Swiss-Prot record:
It comes from the Bacteria. Transmembrane segments: none annotated. Pathway: Amino-acid biosynthesis; L-methionine biosynthesis via salvage pathway; S-methyl-5-thio-alpha-D-ribose 1-phosphate from S-methyl-5'-thioadenosine (hydrolase route): step 1/2. Catalyzes the irreversible cleavage of the glycosidic bond in both 5'-methylthioadenosine (MTA) and S-adenosylhomocysteine (SAH/AdoHcy) to adenine and the corresponding thioribose, 5'-methylthioribose and S-ribosylhomocysteine, respectively. Also cleaves 5'-deoxyadenosine, a toxic by-product of radical S-adenosylmethionine (SAM) enzymes, into 5-deoxyribose and adenine. This is 5'-methylthioadenosine/S-adenosylhomocysteine nucleosidase. CDD domains: MTAN. Signal peptide: none annotated. Pfam families: PNP_UDP_1. The gene is mtnN. SUPFAM superfamilies: Purine and uridine phosphorylases. The active site is at residues 13, 198.
Amino acid sequence: MTKIGIIGAMDEEVELLKSKLSNCSERTIAECEFYTGTIEGKEIVLLKSGIGKVNAAIGTTLLIQLFQPTAIINTGSAGGLDSSLHVGDLAISTEVRYNDVDATVFGYEFGQVPQMPAFYQPDDMLIDIAIEAAKTVGIPSKKGLILSGDSFMSDAALVEQLKRRFNYPLCSEMEAGAIAQVCHRFGVPFVIIRSLSDIAGAEAKVSYDEFLETASVNSANLVLAIVGRLG
């Protein structure tokens, strides 16, 4: 039976998904909250990991080791970097990179953790399913690069630097890189789904405060559509 791991960082990002779980049971380990149950007959392990890369890595490792999911979907909000995307729109990962790692003095690419890949490749089948599912939720979507780092992108100069440094990033957020790296190490297929709560830059916090719930619901609705298409 397919067992799908779904990861969100905050209450807002898992609330809708938790409400859809049948026969839900809860377990907390190292402050990571796990909710197990079913959605549309599929076995689900929903994790609220906490915010940031280390929390995400801890939670993802526990999820894989304790529950052995066949695939992992990461859901949540992000700050937009692509001018064609608007608040509430959806981003589907085709690659994931860190935006706050610099070992270039040793010949690595910017964003590349030493001895690790320069970027992390989501599962092709999950990407295709996400793209098809996005057509049914009535929200504009785009596939591409998602950046990840332990900073909220409210510095306009830093945002412009990231846009110059990376090729056409869709958005930036704070957990996906760690989740992708852990999935890579364990060989678990994954895809990252984000909805924009803000446009990264000086006004990002104001938008984030207003639209976090909208972004969280939009991302969760796409995850539900993906779950419905998984075998």
